[in-house]
Amino acid sequence: MSAATTVLAQGAAQKITPPSIEYSSLSPMLILFGVALAGVLVDAFAPPKARRVLQPLLAGAGFIGAFVAVVLLHAHRQVLAAGAVAIDGPTLFLQGTILVFALLSVLLVAERRLDSSGGALVASAAVVPGSRGSTAQRTSPDVQTEAYPLMVFSVSGMLLFVASNNLLVMFVALEILSLPLYLLCGLARRRRLLSQEAAMKYFLLGAFSSAFFLYGVAFAYGYAGSVELGRVADAVGTVGQNDTYLYLSLALLGVGLFFKIGAAPFHSWTPDVYQGAPTPITAFMAAGTKVAAFGALLRVFYVAFGGMRWDWRPVIWAVAILTMVVGAVLALTQRDIKRMLAYSAVAHAGFLLVGMAGSNIDGLRGAMFYLVTYGFTTIAAFAVVSLVRTGDGEASDLSQWQGLGRTSPLLAGTFAFLLLALAGIPLTSGFTGKFAVFQAAIAGDATPLVVVALVCSAIAAFFYVRVIVLMFFSEPLADGPVVVTRPTLTFATVGIGALMTLLLGVAPQPLLDLATTAATSGFVR
């Protein structure tokens, strides 16, 4: 018998043990992957009229089912799938938050009464703007029902992103959540050129940031000999290791994650994409993507690089200050309501980084609570924007909102309340969210950072109040926009978002207790 045959015989005699996978602990993600595949089959084989009903129901049922699975896992705390996925308090809290925001976003996407031709999304992203096909597409009643499985795929990537305990798995999750969004951004029914430009910019810059992230993964492996977050943490500070690889890994991973949260100076995609994307997709990105990206950022910095927090804290300080200043100052110059809200999102990313700069349990709790408060408010705000329309689509220019408080006082009053919440006025969720992160920063000896945040909050309040003054203290335009009163789903979304903004402002303790429990349990590794 030859040597090769002997080796093969010995290998065949050995029992290969497959990895143990707790499928029940992965059920939220598995449910969504299954629903997304079912959505693809529905779109391929169901008739058009049936698709319009089945797809939103299927997506909504999937999000509800995944949320129930998250609730049932509340007591779980384990690393599974060969160390690739971590189920712990922060993971489950953030996954539940993402699913709630995704369900609200589905209501906006499913709305067909806003536009005379149908929903906010069209049936094809590749039609040349200004062409005969583009004109026909704008007035066609066809609905892009593929948007629903794309959304479900993206949300499943978000759930995996916040649960990843392995940098390569985190990269895969990043691509799963990002690729559907690139396409969804280009599906706006109106202003096709702006929408396609947004999709292209988001794709190119997103691919660029993903390359940075992947390069950071390579350096982490070169330093620690592993891409598992726990093993990277064990290698930090080890004698004889090449710290150059460690710092390069931290910097490159940070660039990739700062891009996803829209932090300066990696925020340049945010205003263009928020403005050009269909407003339901903008709301979905503004809330869901920010939660997922911050969840991954917190896990990477707290788990893998927690042992060198004194090295990365100054970087967080600098990025937080730059992000708050850029977001607040540039929002002052905007004349488009969606671009203004985009720069507001940049500023809020800076406020979230203030809590992270505390690098303590209070910072983790404050950041998670802030993400919930911000998400409800911003989804409701973009839903209001979609209701104010002209004959050419949404009235996004600020001058068109002049006198809206006199023609539609209820809607204008709701929008004013949401803007005040974003500004952080007491008795709103914005105030309690900022209080939570600022308190954590002070406890973590970052008081100067809180002072800068308060100054930027005052600057930000100016452009919020400017819109309120324009709506209530200006004469309405003769040919001004109208408020569409038929969209039941959109009004329901506005109502839910505004109600949660109020409840989390006057009675935040139940959610704070939930965030405290999740943060105290900590990250597993």
UniProtKB/Swiss-Prot annotation:
Top enzyme class: translocase
UniProt-listed GO biological process terms: ATP synthesis coupled electron transport
Keyword Translocase recorded: yes
Catalytic reaction list: a quinone + NADH + 5 H(+)(in) = a quinol + NAD(+) + 4 H(+)(out)
Name of one Pfam family that matches: Proton_antipo_M
MF GO annotations: NADH dehydrogenase (ubiquinone) activity; NADH:ubiquinone reductase (non-electrogenic) activity; quinone binding
Localization annotation: Cell membrane
A GO CC term attached to the entry: plasma membrane
Highest taxon, organism lineage: Bacteria
Keywords: Cell membrane, Membrane, NAD, Quinone, Translocase, Transmembrane, Transmembrane helix, Transport
Membrane topology term: Multi-pass membrane protein
Transmembrane segments: 26-46, 53-73, 90-110, 143-163, 167-187, 202-222, 246-266, 278-298, 314-334, 341-361, 368-388, 411-431, 449-469, 487-507
EC number of the protein: 7.1.1.-
Function: NDH-1 shuttles electrons from NADH, via FMN and iron-sulfur (Fe-S) centers, to quinones in the respiratory chain. The immediate electron acceptor for the enzyme in this species is believed to be a menaquinone. Couples the redox reaction to proton translocation (for every two electrons transferred, four hydrogen ions are translocated across the cytoplasmic membrane), and thus conserves the redox energy in a proton gradient.
HAMAP family: NDH1_NuoN_1
Membership in a protein family: Belongs to the complex I subunit 2 family.
Quaternary structure note: NDH-1 is composed of 14 different subunits. Subunits NuoA, H, J, K, L, M, N constitute the membrane sector of the complex.
Protein name as catalogued: NADH-quinone oxidoreductase subunit N
Gene that this sequence comes from: nuoN
